Regions:
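Alpha/beta catalytic cores of nucleotide-metabolism and tRNA/nucleoside-modifying enzymes
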Residues: 1-18, 22-23, 28, 132-135, ...
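Glycine-rich, positively charged N-terminal anion/phosphate-binding segment
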Residues: 5-13, 27-101
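A cross-domain feature marking catalytic cores of carbohydrate-active enzymes
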Residues: 26, 52, 80-82, 107, ...
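Non-cysteine beta-strand/loop elements that form the S-adenosyl-L-methionine
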Residues: 50, 102-111, 186-197, 255-258
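Active-site-adjacent beta->alpha loops and helix N-cap segments on the catalytic face
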Residues: 58-66, 111-136, 200-220, 262-267
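Active-site beta->alpha loop and helix N-cap motifs at the rims of alpha/beta catalytic domains
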Residues: 75-146, 150-158, 162, 167-172
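Catalytic beta/alpha-barrel core
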Residues: 125-126, 192-194, 211-212, 233-234
Length: 353
């Protein structure tokens, strides 16, 4: 059931309670409230993020629809898109009022559509404006204000050599330092750094996640330079060992598509980071029934089953019957009148959990 998400606990108390070592990135068309509810079942601690929502949409649109979420999703952060300080501050206040534990500003999305609105990755060229936006939000809310960014931005036509995108000269690192210094001075609580450059123009968002090479060394050097500012590294992490290694030098790791396609990585990380709890990996059957019950509640409120099941295709990844599980949820969930029982039926195609 969709809710405002309010918990009755003060924003300061909530901020102190959140374990920010592992998080799941905001991903357009993916990390909606149904996806977040599903992912929450794998770990009680992982910090989840909304899809990017523009400040203008929140101020002019249906806030219940845009900002509502199930309390079980907590801890969950709201990512905003925009470049106007007063507008972002008002949207941040709306997000805090809805119960989000953090407000994040998108300064990393390289898509042409986002760039046409003069926000996303192109904002990295305007550190003074971003600092003004952060300060305005910080003055308006008590929850932490964070920024998601790249290590830099370049303009390259697709036909040109991409080799220069791999280079990172002293001038580029100086620009990165100036940007982060401006964030820190404005009161940014945490910088979330995708360890790639953003190529503006000529590359699609998908290509921007693959063609610019990963430069964890740049993020590591940034952490050495800004030792007092929490820095989370994002980009390209594929398994638990890589994440745990990165936690040795960073303040957190943000996972993206790996968590979506192989959500059990979240359970593996939870167990690795909390060995004192001696909790076994959550059973797939338990997760399946949790989602079936959720679907029953949501369908009663008018939600289509397919809107929920589309996020569940990785539940039985690597297990016997996984292909049949995915096929049933991918197709039958779209049938008129499809109900939550379909989730249970799909689970029966797989090995006992």
């Amino acid at each position: 059931m969709q809710s405002t998400g309010k918990t009755g606990i003060s924003s300061d108390q909530e901020a102190e309670k959140v374990d920010r070592r592992i998080s799941v990135a905001p991903m357009m068309d993916w990390t909606d409230r149904h996806c977040r509810y599903f992912l929450r079942g794998f770990s009680p601690d992982v910090l989840l993020y909304t899809e990017m929502i523009t400040a203008a949409a929140i101020l002019r649109g249906d806030r219940v629809k845009l900002l509502g979420f199930d309390p079980e999703e907590q801890p969950v952060a709201l990512q905003l898109g925009g470049n106007e300080p007063a507008q972002l501050a008002a949207a941040a206040a709306a997000g805090e009022g809805a119960g989000y534990c953090e407000i994040n500003l998108n300064c990393g999305c390289p898509s042409d559509r986002v760039a046409s609105g003069a926000f996303g990755a192109c904002l990295m060229r305007e550190p003074a404006l971003v600092a003004e936006c952060v300060a305005a939000m910080r003055a308006r809310v008590r929850v932490p204000i964070t920024v998601k960014m790249r290590i830099g931005v370049v303009e390259r036509a697709k036909r040109e050599s991409i080799a220069s995108v791999a280079d990172f000269n002293d001038g580029e690192f100086d620009a990165l330092q100036r940007f982060v210094a401006a964030l820190e001075a404005a009161g940014c609580a945490r910088a979330i750094v995708h360890a790639r450059k953003a190529v503006l123009g000529g590359l699609s968002p998908k290509e921007n996640r693959a063609i610019p090479p990963l430069r964890y060394d740049i993020v590591r050097e940034l952490k050495r330079t800004f030792s007092q500012l929490p820095i989370v590294v994002n980009g390209g992490f594929r398994d638990t060992r890589e994440v745990l290694d990165a936690l040795g030098w960073s303040d957190g790791v943000m996972l993206g598509r790996e968590a979506y396609h192989r959500p059990f990585v979240l359970a593996e990380l939870h167990c690795a980071l909390h060995p004192e709890r001696t909790r076994p990996l959550v059973a797939r059957g338990t997760l399946l029934e949790r989602m079936a019950s959720y679907a029953e509640r949501e369908i009663a409120q008018g939600t289509r089953l397919a809107a929920i099941t589309r996020h569940m295709l990785g539940l039985y990844g690597g297990e016997p019957g996984a292909r049949e599980f995915r096929r049933l949820l991918s197709h039958a969930a779209h049938a008129p009148g499809a109900g939550a029982q379909l989730i249970r039926d799909a689970g029966r195609l797989c090995a006992p959990a």
